[in-house]
Amino acid sequence: DYIHSLGLKFGIYSSPGPTTCGDYLGSYQHEEIDARTWGRWGVDYLKYDHCGYHAVQKDSEEKTIREPYIVMRDALDKVDRDIVYCVGYGAPNVWNWAREAGGELWRTTRDITDEWNVVTAIGCFQDVCAQATAPGNYNDPDMLVVGKLGKAWREKVHESALTPDEQYSHISLWCILSAPLLIGCDMSDIDDFTLSLLTNNEVIAVNQDLLATPATKLLTDNGQIWYKKLYDGSYAVGFFQIDPYFILWDQDEAEAI
């Protein structure tokens, strides 16, 4: 109730295995009791991470990896509460089966860090899975690495290593992708710049557009252009200099899109 009174959602993390990534207890063979407990607590969001499942996994076939996610989906469906279900990354091409396993969103790549080469590698890969995006079903390229962050495995909290321009590009691309906008920073200590990034109504409107149209990537000789059609018939277009070159914009080519 306290979390909800602040206007926030209550998210929780678990694994289909006996343990989680952090070596805490997972939900293996306790799916229904965990789902009921989360419902009673008022949980709004579940990230169900593949970590730990390797200990009991029979093989690496897609069917085997998908199975425990279906078990948890069935358990959540028995709870009298809507809990958004994120299928954690655990297999190649997760976007091909996560929807059928009951996920509303699914992690598409490795964990993100606040390094520009990692952000661009993850973001620019999303055209491979873009067609899986639809209203209520979303590719998740991982959280936004803005603000004060802690690196993996509890390392010291620090300011994002991304430059301001890199952060603009990071959030802009995630919005064009209709990606979930999850922040991993310290919410009690957000600076004005980070707050301005996270509260830009025009950019958020692109992310939240009702159509959730899959984004399209166009390659140029010296950059990338991403675009998607919006509900009102207009287009959101993003220009991204992944490498230190200029992008040349031709209005005739733009109208041909």
Predicted regions and their residues:
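Active-site-adjacent structural elements in folded domains
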Residues: 21-23, 31-33, 157-161, 219-224
